[in-house]
Amino acid sequence: TYMSSRGIIYEGKYRQLVKSKVSDEREHSILSIESKYLVEDKITGLPRWLLYSSLDQDLTEKLTLNIAYNRISDRNYFKDIDRSSPIDLSLKSNLILSYNDPKKNFSASILTEHEQTVSSVPNYQRAIDTSASKIFRSDKESPITLDLTTTKFTHKKSEKASGIRSTGTIGITRTFATEFPVITTKANYDIANYQLKEANDITRKSAGAGISFSFPFNFTSNLQGSYVKNNITPSLSYNYKQKVVQGSIPIFDTTDKYEDIITFADLTSGERYTGRDRVSNAND
C-alpha cells in the first residue's frame, strides 16, 4: 500500500499448520502472523509497524501452549497509518501453558500477560498467574472440588495498589436420589490472602451453603405432524453466604454483575461478582 504522505507500507499474512490435532476432540496447532511495516514515515522519519501473531499448539494430549503477541510501534499508528480512530482499545499479549487430565479430574495452568494501551484506560496486568483445580470423589454422591490460584497484579500507575493475591476454595455438592423433585445441596469455604506492595497484608475467609429444588416435567407435543419431546424444569434455590468485611481489599479484576444478570444460571448461582476480590455477602 502506498500513502503519498507517509510512504510504502508492506503487508503480509502467514498461516501454518504446525501440528495435526492430537485427538478428534482437539483442534489443529496453528501459527498465524499478520504484519504491516512502513520502513520510514516521511513525516516523523521513524519506522511504523503493526504485528498480530498467535500460536496455539498441543504439546501433548494433556499439555497445551497458547501464545498471542499483538503490538504496534506507537499509540498513534491507527490514526496516522490505518486512518482509523478505535475507541477504548488495548492490544493484549499473553502466554498460557495449560495441563488438563480429565481422567484424573485435574487441571493446572500458568499465565503471563501484557497490555499495550492505545485508546483505553490502563488496567491491572497479571504479571504471573498460576492455578490448579482437582475434583476428589468424582464418582461418589458427594464430589469435592479444590481450586487454588496465585496471581501477581501490576499497574502502570504507581498510585494504584499492587501485589499478590492467593486464593483457595473447597466445595462439596450432593444430589439426592429422588426423581421428583431433584434436590441438590452445596457448601463451600473460601480463603484469600493479599500481600500488598505498600499496605498491610489482608486475609479474608468466608463460607456459604445452598440448596435447590428442581421440578422436571416431560411431555410430548405434535408440531406439524411431528412429535416433539419437551422438557420444562422450574427451579427454586436458596443460597447463603456469611457476612464479611471486604471494603479494604483492592479490586484487581472483579466486577459486579448484578445489573447484567441475563441468564437463569447466573440468577440462581448465588455468585454476584466476577473475579475473586469480592464475595457475595449475606442478602446481596
State what each model feature region is.
Residues 1-284:
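Outer-membrane beta-barrel proteins and related beta-barrel translocases across Gram-negative bacteria
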